[in-house]
Amino acid sequence: MKFRILPVMLAAAVFAAYPAHAQEAAAQAQAAPAPATPADQAANQPAEKGELSIIEENDSLFSDSDKHYTQGARASYLSAPLTAGWRYDAFDFLGPLFPSSADRQRRFDWIVLGQSIFTPMNLKLSPPSATDRPYAGWLYTGGELLQENGGNSLTGFEVLLGVVGPAALGRQVQNDWHQFIVGIPGGAGWDNQLKNEPAVALSYDKHWRLGIVELGGVGVDFVPEADVTAGNVFTYGAVGGIIRIGNSLDTDYGPPRIRPGPSGTDWVDPSRRSASFGYYFFAGGEGRAVAQNIFLDGNTFAHSRSVDKKPLVGDLTAGVAMSWKDEIRFDLGLLSRTKEFYGQQGQDSYAGFRFTFKL
């Protein structure tokens, strides 16, 4: 199995001071200290650590060759909860995008590095078939502000910045890895890949956690989601959701996946864990109305290869997620995607996994 993983990695605190007034007041304060404020209580708690996650998605489980969306890898760092202060308020300029509530919790998810690779079905042709999707790579970094309200709804705003084209190193990762590590030939048509182009993707998404039933420590819930993404990489609107069965369901909103795909999230609140060993099985899907996909439509500012994309695309997914205390999380999922362009031969399927650990 041909897995290519991109790794990398890195947290803060608050303080307060209260002026003394009169000698008598100071003596009373020593005799009967004032109740601790929420800020004092937070400062006295052990600092929660951030988490590093590695995601790998690959089609090798379902075929003996690469085709279409053949490889995705991403390293991300989820911060501890942001406390009151400039970092907490830095995203308030987004205003109504983030609902206001007294119990909101914010975290920042730094997308350290990500890469996606796309190829036609027949890797031996050079130039490749004009009716098959073009060779392309996407290399990016970015971040997402995640805010939870009421313990059961999550809002995210993500910015991804990078490059599409030879500078994304798709050719080197696919061909050099295959020949040096696995010993099989790579794609012969990379000279025809999309040209270099700055790549931007802005995404706004919502998740809701709807409990259905819980019995004997095992629960069932439904997590619907809606997502709008815009940019020269992707422009689409999506709705979907997953059903989960297991324990500690209120610690997260489902496993994350690389866009475009059923958009889970890195968000987790381990303080809600109900057992040392957490697990759940999940199944669901997502439907997308697609206005732009650079990997099918071709370059925005230059002539390049392209195919006629389909405006509606759907994904079905199923898998399992596991965690041990607050230290390690792992999930594995399988995904099947409907045809993305006219003339495509067969649907695509791939496997994805995530490994997360505290730093």
Where are the model-predicted features located?
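Outer membrane beta-barrel transmembrane domains
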Residues: 121-124, 242, 247-359
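Short loop/turn motifs that connect adjacent beta-strands in outer-membrane beta-barrel proteins
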Residues: 37-49, 81-107, 148-156, 209-222, ...
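Transmembrane beta-barrel strands of outer-membrane/channel proteins
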Residues: 52-58, 109-117, 159-165, 206, ...
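Residues on the lipid-exposed face of transmembrane beta-strands in outer-membrane beta-barrel proteins
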Residues: 73-79, 113, 141-147, 161-163, ...
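Short glycine/proline- and aromatic-enriched beta-strand/turn motifs that initiate or cap beta-hairpins
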Residues: 24-30, 35-85, 113, 118-122, ...
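Residues that define the transmembrane beta-barrel architecture of outer-membrane proteins
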Residues: 67-73, 135-139, 155, 196-202, ...
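Long, hydrophobic/aromatic-enriched structural stretches that serve as scaffold segments
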Residues: 93-171
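Extracellular loop and loop/strand-boundary signature of outer-membrane beta-barrel proteins
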Residues: 98, 126-131, 186-192, 227, ...
